[in-house]
């Protein structure tokens, strides 16, 4: 049976996370990730994130945290911040899901609020992992020679429309 990691790094400060995320400008053609820094304090978004992005592990007092990525994208600054958070709150690893999201394992349940606050500061506190809000897309014509459409642009529009209709997203949970 797997056991929890013994030693962990100190959690980076909110200022350190913000500095990592803002250190590198995103550039290039096509759709690039927009970093939306959030407060991460108590509120509706955090409540929704706790409901959709947190899953208990079979080991008592531990959880796995799903980091929902819009269109599967993150910046180099966000990657650096996520690496620091994985060392401080998890086992130092980050796993990729089939939904183009990321998973941090071995997070102590009591440390989830601090982790969420730092994820939100890094622009990675997006709720809705594994729900209809979590739109997945292939690269499309941005980088695939076989593609004939801008599937990422359409996926972004679908995600924005779903975000404007919270009642619709609630109704699809049992589908």
Range-by-range predicted roles:
Residues 1-175:
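Peripheral terminal and linker regions in Fe-S/redox and tRNA-modifying enzymes
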């Amino acid at each position: 049976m797997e056991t929890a990691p013994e030693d962990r790094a100190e959690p980076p400060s909110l200022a350190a996370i913000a500095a990592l995320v803002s250190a590198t400008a995103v550039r290039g053609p096509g759709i690039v990730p927009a970093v939306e820094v959030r407060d991460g304090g108590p509120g509706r978004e955090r409540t929704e994130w706790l409901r959709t992005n947190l899953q208990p592990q079979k080991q008592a007092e531990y959880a796995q945290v799903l980091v929902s990525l819009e269109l599967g994208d993150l910046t180099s600054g966000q990657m650096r911040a996520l690496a620091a958070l994985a060392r401080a709150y998890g086992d130092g690893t980050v796993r990729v899901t089939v939904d183009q999201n990321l998973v941090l394992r071995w997070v102590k349940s009591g440390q989830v609020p601090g982790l969420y606050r730092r994820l939100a500061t890094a622009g990675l506190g997006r709720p809705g992992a594994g729900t209809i809000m979590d739109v997945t897309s292939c690269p499309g014509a941005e980088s695939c020679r076989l593609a004939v459409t801008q599937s990422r642009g359409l996926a972004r529009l679908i995600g924005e429309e779903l975000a404007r209709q919270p009642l619709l997203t609630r109704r699809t949970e049992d589908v």
